[in-house]
């Protein structure tokens, strides 16, 4: 560490790296469930006026199956196709100002729209963390369908004998074991806007 940063800073970076890994693992396990959900819960194609009825039906089906409020989640780019379905000719000035100031609507036909934070994959600014083509239709207030399990405690091993490494540095290794699973009896929907 050469006294360039404190041990507390190192631990904070380790925690941030583990957190990023867990978030990416959860997202990847959820995104791979799409095709296994069945045609009632997984749709593909552009969201336009022609597919509006199918989109509305998917939202309704998730709400009925979960007996709860539903939200539509996606990145700003993914939600843009839903924004385009909102007609503002009849809207109040407050709604028009919301679109003008934020570039988006907070609701689509009474359904809350939730923007997922986007980011780049580690060391690659050409790959996004979250697909810009995927919308998630998720129930609110039900038990989470994604389960995260840690096995045991996170362990840290240190080599603090300056003679062990040729350059006389110390080394540390952090180990944690976890698993992620998606329970598919909780109904949710996915819409892939890739054409």
Where are these regions (language model features)?
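Alpha-helical scaffold segments that mediate packing/assembly in large oligomeric complexes
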Residues: 1-65
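Short loop/turn segments at secondary-structure transitions that flank enzyme active sites
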Residues: 20, 24, 78-80, 178
């Amino acid at each position: 560490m050469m006294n360039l940063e404190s041990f507390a800073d190192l631990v904070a970076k380790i925690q941030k790296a583990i957190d990023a890994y867990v978030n990416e693992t959860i997202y990847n396990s959820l995104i791979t469930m799409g095709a296994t959900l069945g045609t009632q819960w997984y749709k593909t194609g552009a969201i336009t006026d022609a597919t509006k009825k199918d989109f509305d039906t998917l939202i309704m089906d998730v709400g009925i199956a979960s007996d709860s409020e539903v939200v539509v989640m996606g990145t700003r780019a993914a939600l843009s196709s839903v924004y385009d379905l909102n007609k503002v000719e009849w809207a109040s000035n407050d709604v028009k100002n919301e679109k003008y100031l934020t570039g988006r609507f907070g609701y689509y036909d009474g359904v809350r729209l939730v923007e997922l934070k986007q980011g780049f994959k580690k060391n690659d600014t050409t790959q996004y963390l979250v697909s810009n083509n995927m919308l998630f239709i998720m129930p609110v207030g039900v038990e989470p369908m994604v389960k995260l399990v840690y096995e045991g405690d996170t362990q840290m091993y240190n080599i603090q004998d300056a003679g062990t490494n040729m350059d006389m540095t110390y080394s540390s290794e952090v180990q944690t074991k976890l698993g992620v699973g998606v329970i598919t009896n909780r109904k949710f929907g996915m819409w892939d806007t890739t054409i």
